[in-house]
Amino acid sequence: MKIGVLSDSHVSSFDQLHEKILLALADVDLIIHAGDFVAKDVLDGLKQLGELKAVRGNMDSDELKEILPEKELLEIEGRKIGIIHGWGSPHGIDDRVGNVFSGVDIIIYGHSHYSQNETKNSVLFFNPGQARNSFGILTIGAEVSGEIIEL
């Protein structure tokens, strides 16, 4: 399964997302957004592209905070995936989000605006970075691989 991952889009409308992101998301099986859409129009636009799983971020509108969960747990191709926005300083954020989930194979998060694609203690920590600068593609099958795509 091919998953498009983004976070921290920080735009007020869907049409402000980078064209390269939109082209890539047209070719995935699932879209995951790790929060800080800012505007509901971005959420609605992503839903038009395909199946979307999303969590809320600290900068999201009150409307989004009411309809999106703080965290999400999925199982895809036998792999458990935790999704959360994150909080606090970029330093140590992977440890903080790592403490939220147990028994997962992948943790997808955002907030720091710094991308990460690193395995620690058998868990892939995947942060696509701020969507104005980068996004990610996760491929899940017999193996799991992540790629950060710079804009």
Question: What name fits each language-model region?
Answer:
Residues 6, 76-77, 99-103, 120-121, ...:
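Binuclear metal-dependent phosphoesterase catalytic core
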Residues 11-14, 37-42, 59-65, 88-93, ...:
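Active-site environment of divalent metal-dependent phosphoester hydrolases
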Residues 5-7, 30-36, 53-58, 83-85, ...:
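Active-site neighborhood of phospho(di)ester-bond hydrolases with catalytic His/Asp-centered motifs
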Residues 1-50, 60-69, 78, 151:
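N-terminal active-site segment of His-dependent metallophosphoesterases
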Residues 50-53, 68-72, 122-126:
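Active-site regions of enzymes building and remodeling cell-envelope glycoconjugates
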Residues 22, 44, 71-73, 98-99, ...:
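Short secondary-structure boundary/capping segments
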Residues 19-20, 47, 69, 90, ...:
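Generic secondary-structure boundary signal with a strong preference for alpha-helix termini
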Residues 74-107:
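Mid-chain, well-packed structural core segment of small domains
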